[in-house]
């Protein structure tokens, strides 16, 4: 079976050309990687191991009812995390095995609803995590 990703420059995806459509998200995540609420809004998205780039997070951030976002083993880095600020319902994010550093944690600090953050292994430091925890009291950070 082959998938053609509309709006992507290559079959590998992750080019930042997602277009923001649900079809693109569904093709990337697959049926098991997406959960919706009773109004059809995406609340859970698992894109772990997929060809997701920083620019793709702008499309993901349009889904403001998102509560859980799994981006482990993707091409996401610090710049992409700036797009996540509109996700005021986001509770859990996994950024394990990504290029995230302390600079990216500053963007996550703006997502006040976060309760669990998975960052192992990444390039974050103890100091960066301490700063994040100070900005988000009660957040659990695993790194």
Where are the regions that the model predicts?
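Post-signal peptide N-terminal segment of mature Sec-exported envelope proteins
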Residues: 16-41
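Bacterial N-terminal signal peptides
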Residues: 1-4
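Concave beta-strand-loop units of leucine-rich repeat
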Residues: 30-31, 40-143
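Bacterial signal peptide processing site
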Residues: 7-11
């Amino acid at each position: 079976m082959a998938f053609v990703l509309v709006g992507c420059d290559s079959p590998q995806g992750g080019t930042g050309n997602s277009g923001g459509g649900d079809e693109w998200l569904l093709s990337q995540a697959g049926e098991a990687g997406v959960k919706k609420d009773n109004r059809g809004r995406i609340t859970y998205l698992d894109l772990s191991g997929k060809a997701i780039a920083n620019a793709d997070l702008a499309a993901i951030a349009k889904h403001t009812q998102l509560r859980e976002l799994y981006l482990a083993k993707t091409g996401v880095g610090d710049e992409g995390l700036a797009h996540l600020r509109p996700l005021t319902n986001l509770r859990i994010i996994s950024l394990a095995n990504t290029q995230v550093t302390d600079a990216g944690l500053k963007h996550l600090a703006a997502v006040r609803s976060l309760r669990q953050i998975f960052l192992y292994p990444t390039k974050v430091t103890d100091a960066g995590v301490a700063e994040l925890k100070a900005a988000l009291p009660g957040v659990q950070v695993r790194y």
